[in-house]
Amino acid sequence: MTSNEKLALITEAADELKAERIETLDIRAKSSVADYFVVCSGTSDRHVQSIAERVAEKMTVQKSRPFRVEGERSGWVLQDYGDVVLHVMRDEQREFYDLEALWESMQPDPNLA
């Protein structure tokens, strides 16, 4: 799957379970870690877990499994699909860590151009 196909499938799956504030961050010019981050919120720990599970199910059907999964019971689940990384967070964690502002304020890396 291409990055854009993964991105579309991940955001669609998150939206199906009513994830809130789904944001896509294009980090290609800022990091070699991934091309995109998808950040979304769940209303409870169970909602966060359900969103992450739905994404994993949809991606598995397409033969794409995460390289790594972190925080399955912590209110912040991270699924690393290589070029696309999903962050599903409770609002409290999202406000505290503010990944969107962190990555948007970061300057492009000239070595990645």
For the regions a protein language model found, what residue spans apply to each?
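Polybasic/polar functional segments that serve as interface/processing modules
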Residues: 1-33, 43-79, 84, 91-95, ...
